[in-house]
Amino acid sequence: MTELETSIKIDVKTEYIEDQSSPNDERYLFRYTITIINLGKEPVTLKTRYWSITDSNQHLSVVQGAGVVGETPTIEPDTAYQYTSGTVLETPFGVMEGNYGMVTENGEMFKAKIPPFRLSIPGLLH
């Protein structure tokens, strides 16, 4: 990994949204809150996102596009940006991972890796 790639820390919290899910219809809604922390020495701007979402049936969905939740935030050194979004799975368990396409003030582009995280209804996994 490059110095730029290691300057970004990503924390994830997930939540199963039971009241908006319908297991009988194979619809499981999950919310995830992402915190992106800039540990580097210069501002970076989040330009793109890429998600790989796999449910427990090994069905793969890929989501990519500009920014996150309609924004392309600039994250100053020693600060964080947080947002919440969601996804629907056909199974009660899945895994998400991906990356953010970032750019420095000097125009240097790099990818900040989003480590794999679980989406699971409570009590399913021990």
Swiss-Prot record:
Gene3D superfamilies: ApaG domain. Signal peptide: none annotated. One of its GO terms (biological process) is error-free translesion synthesis. SUPFAM superfamilies: ApaG-like. Residues 2-126 form the ApaG domain. InterPro entries: ApaG_domain, ApaG_sf, Uncharacterised_ApaG. It holds the Pfam family DUF525. NCBIfam families: PRK05461.1. PANTHER family: F-BOX ONLY PROTEIN 3 (PTHR14289), POLYMERASE DELTA-INTERACTING PROTEIN 2 (PTHR14289:SF16). This is Protein ApaG. It comes from Shewanella woodyi (strain ATCC 51908 / MS32).
